[in-house]
Amino acid sequence: MKFEYPLIPATLLRRYKRFLADVELSDGSTITVHCPNTGSMRNCIVENSPCWLLDSANPKRKYRYSLERVTTPTGAVAGINSASANGLVIAAIENGVISELQGYDELAREQRYGDEKSRIDILLSKPEEQCYIEVKSVTLEEGKGEGFFPDAVSTRGQKHLRELMAMRSQGHRAVLFFCVQHSGITKVAAAEHIDPAYAALFKQAVNEGVEVIAYGVDLGIEGSVITKKLKVV
């Protein structure tokens, strides 16, 4: 996924009210930008650290710039725009990067499914087979190279695991896809120490045939692209 304009370097001063952050630009001026991540962003926010902004090029927008990348406590770079994960995975599927998800005829987004009235992120289909894919953006690193999801208790994430298990029980292929937007993470696990209920459902889902796939993202100044498979533990 290529940005319309290259990212702009800045210094992160603080994040507040979940959706806002104050940053200092290279000319010394301070502006408020939109933070496109509603999660805890645990281990991602370091005050007075380098960050990168995306310019919407829309002067009428209340917050013209969005916080796209941050520097973590370990010095790694994290892409904190969780909404971009679906697009990254779709592009990687279409470009043949994700070998596990090739061979389908159609790709649909945000289709309604399941008893809990969810929307599947990606639905792949071919004659006599459907593949339901839930995409999760991973940015939490704890320990050297160890990535975890979720970074806070996630009842929504728990619901998605139940829905995937239901699809698998009906004979469909079901996939949980971890899109790792963090340059320091080399392996991913369910965060039992943060959300024990999610971790228990994760183990149950794996035992019932839900596939778990993790890939890392190359976080460039001009765009992002999924590049390599990572280990799930």
From Swiss-Prot:
Organism: Saccharophagus degradans (strain 2-40 / ATCC 43961 / DSM 17024)
This protein's name: Sugar fermentation stimulation protein homolog
CDD domains: SfsA-like_bacterial
One GO MF term: DNA binding
Pfam families, sorted: SfsA (PF03749), SfsA_N (PF17746)
UniProt record similarity statement: Belongs to the SfsA family.
Gene3D superfamilies: 2.40.50.580, 3.40.1350.60
Gene: sfsA
InterPro entries: SfsA, SfsA_C, SfsA_N
Highest taxon listed in the record's lineage: Bacteria
